[in-house]
A protein has these predicted regions:
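N-terminal, charge-rich interaction modules
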Residues: 1-76, 86, 93, 151-154, ...
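Short, non-transmembrane amphipathic alpha-helical segments
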Residues: 82-90, 140-149
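Short glycine-rich or small-residue beta-strand-to-loop segments that form or flank ligand, phosphate
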Residues: 66-72, 97-99, 125-131
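A domain-level signal for the structural core that forms small-molecule/cofactor-binding pockets
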Residues: 54-55, 96, 114, 130, ...
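Long, charge-dense
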Residues: 81-120, 158-163
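Extended, charge-rich low-complexity interaction segments
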Residues: 118-142
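Short acidic, glycine/serine/threonine-rich loops at helix termini
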Residues: 108, 139-141, 167-170
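Gly/Ser/Thr-rich loops at beta-strand to alpha-helix junctions
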Residues: 72-79, 131-139, 162
Length: 170
């Protein structure tokens, strides 16, 4: 190579668009509402006591937060108990999910991914970034692929300098 020739960044000149899943990672405040705290002897949900406890609960601590409603105790919880908790949370909370904090995070992540406009990637070569600071669930990569496959020219996984081909339009 002649030292007088300018260096050309072939990656930058390739027209590849990098989509970083971390950009869609949920940053909102989350909370967990655990029904185990309302069980009699850690096993039984008494309707009258439960209704009274929810009526006296300070729901403002969930204001603007996304909430996972779960029961971490090994108990049989009637469906109406989750419904009743949701009826109190709905006016103050953001998203409400039946499940643990991971389920809530998954729902929020997928909701954020759904804001991607596929038209922005029409006939483009897309690399879905695979390495980062934040652990990203496999479901995110699958959803991005599902969303972009109908429009993208190609989809790759990794970094622009080292990719694994996923899809290429014929």
């Amino acid at each position: 190579m002649n030292m007088s020739e300018p260096l050309i960044n072939k990656v930058a000149a390739s027209g590849i668009i990098t989509l970083n899943p971390e950009d869609y990672y949920p940053k909102e405040e989350m909370a967990v509402f655990d029904l185990k705290d309302y069980l009699f002897m850690g096993l039984i949900l008494k309707e009258k006591d439960f209704r009274e406890a929810l009526k006296n609960q300070d729901w403002d601590k969930y204001k603007g937060r996304h909430v996972a409603v779960t029961c971490s105790a090994d108990a049989i919880i009637p469906v109406w108990a989750y419904m009743l908790a949701a009826s109190y949370l709905e006016p103050v909370a953001g998203e409400i999910v039946m499940g643990d904090e991971k389920e809530l995070q998954k729902k929020l992540f997928l909701k954020n991914i759904s804001t991607i406009d596929p038209a922005d990637f029409a006939d483009k070569r897309v690399v879905v970034k695979g390495c980062g600071e934040t652990p990203i669930g496999d479901y995110v990569y699958m959803e991005i692929t599902r969303l972009l496959r109908p429009v993208a020219k190609s989809i790759m996984y990794g970094e622009p300098c080292s990719t694994v081909p996923i899809f290429k339009k014929k």
